[in-house]
Amino acid sequence: MKTVTVKDLVIGTGAPKIIVSLMAKDIASVKSEALAYREADFDILEWRVDHYADLSNVESVLAAAKILRETMPEKPLLFTFRSAKEGGEQAISTEAYIALNRAAIDSGLVDMIDLELFTGDDQVKETVAYAHAHDVKVVMSNHDFHKTPEAEEIIARLRKMQSFDADIPKIALMPQSTSDVLTLLAATLEMQEQYADRPIITMSMAKTGVISRLAGEVFGSAATFGAVKKASAPGQISVNDLRTVLTILHQA
């Protein structure tokens, strides 16, 4: 299986990489949060742009991205607008969503974008090609904050992302029971062993699913999300605790 290298970080080998989400509402908070995050132990910085109030002002968005890039130049920067339908803060049109991601790609300030699988097949394929032409990696994602589908459906979605040439397919699901967590882990393992030719990221959310955020190296998830301050999704634990557990499991 091939790995994905962003800056000096190799994703898809060794312990799962830690992603943290920065969710600032304006440029002043982007600056202050970035300074606080700089001291934390993580691997990838995700900027959750859907929390940013001045979204319609592309210059403002890119000015904020520039602050993040300059404050943490060594960290891979993942640009993510999470749509309202997949658990994000704002709803925008598909056209605006694609335009926003293209502006981020054009800027040269971001290393990766998050692209939601169910944006529309043609738009997704075109945006992946556009990103790759500009040397930007694509995390293709799907989130369900209500339920966990059957393992076959989880695998089908991850395989579809792979067929659309995502660098890293990602799925996050809400368990209604502990057995839903096992479904997610079993699907992850089957995907990793039988179909994946690149790193994948999977997680089961909330307290019930916390084990999935820790056991990625065992079952085949290449990265996990931790919290520096406020969690960006239910079930995230602090980056320091997360690094400790991931290291213990890696060295066992």
UniProtKB/Swiss-Prot annotation:
The lineage of its organism: Bacteria, Pseudomonadati, Pseudomonadota, Gammaproteobacteria, Enterobacterales. Pathway: Metabolic intermediate biosynthesis; chorismate biosynthesis; chorismate from D-erythrose 4-phosphate and phosphoenolpyruvate: step 3/7. Its EC number is 4.2.1.10. This is 3-dehydroquinate dehydratase. Belongs to the type-I 3-dehydroquinase family. Involved in the third step of the chorismate pathway, which leads to the biosynthesis of aromatic amino acids. Catalyzes the cis-dehydration of 3-dehydroquinate (DHQ) and introduces the first double bond of the aromatic ring to yield 3-dehydroshikimate. One of its GO terms (biological process) is chorismate biosynthetic process. Homodimer. It is an enzyme of class 4 (lyase). PROSITE patterns: DEHYDROQUINASE_I. It catalyses: 3-dehydroquinate = 3-dehydroshikimate + H2O.
